[in-house]
Amino acid sequence: MGNQLDRITHLNYSELPTGDPSGIEKDELRVGVAYFFSDEEEDLDERGQPDKFGVKAPPGCAPCPESPSRHHHHHHHHHLLHQLVLNETQFSAFRGQECIFSKVSGGPQGADLSVYAVTALPALCEPGDLLELLWLQPAPEPPAPAPHWAVYVGGGQIIHLCQGEIRQDSLYEAGAANVGRVVNSWYRYRPLVAELVVQNACGHLGLKSEEICWTNSESFAAWCRFGKREFKAGGEVPAGTQPPQQQYYLKVHLADNKVHTARFHSLEDLIREKRRIDASGRLRVLQELADLVDDKE
């Protein structure tokens, strides 16, 4: 598509809600601990992004034409996007003292939290990329759903866990999300090569609820890219039997450099709580959405 896009994220913080929106407190998921970590993270050079790979469509996948280079959009000026102001909670996650996830802006290893119109994403993506799709709406509206994760397989197509089924859909039509971003670097695990990521996704097409061992779209998409059993439901030892260095800690970064930390016995539980916070209205658009989405050309 070759669009030159403004980066469209400004971040404000708001206080973390103290209760579950349903009114049911899940104590086992919200065990606060007086456990804080140094701001210095481990050297992550072994977790860098892989080289680019040409990806062929495995059996069962629709053809995935090669996507335009993710840098191609720098060479053209077309449909500049209005800047959005997001009120978005930032997270980091640890297993013991090892950082395994970071959605925190700033610093040398800060996450890129820029969001783009869904119609612009194919120009920024390559097969095997992880996408986070967002439903942004004006501040007075009810909270949007939790962010939806998917694997990009080329040709404007994604594979994702949606409504209890693993399916392949057009990126432009998936859930009518209006913006998204590439989130390959948020999890700090070593990624599989792009061809294997696409094969993992395609190999599970058509599975339905009773056959699926992931509890949400993020866990499925992340498993496709990293291949770690911890993303599967029940993929870890029973709760309460791990030593502290094997337990998980979610840090929620609040205003004034405050951090709320909670402990979990599995990555599955940590992801569930992180997504609950995301779905509780922390993601808001504070200005007009006019001209948000490019023409679908």
Swiss-Prot record:
Location(s), subcellular: Cytoplasm
A GO biological-process term: cell morphogenesis
A GO-annotated cellular component: cytoplasm
Family matches, as InterPro entries: LRAT_dom, LRATD1_LRATD2
Keyword Cytoplasm belongs to the record: yes
Modification type Phosphoserine: residues: S38
One Pfam family recorded for the sequence: LRAT
Keywords: Cytoplasm, Phosphoprotein
Domain LRAT as annotated: residue spans: 138-233
PROSITE patterns with a match to the protein in the record: LRAT (PS51934)
Keyword match Lyase: no
Main location: cytoplasm
Family: Belongs to the LRATD family.
Name the record gives this protein: Protein LRATD1
Organism: Bos taurus
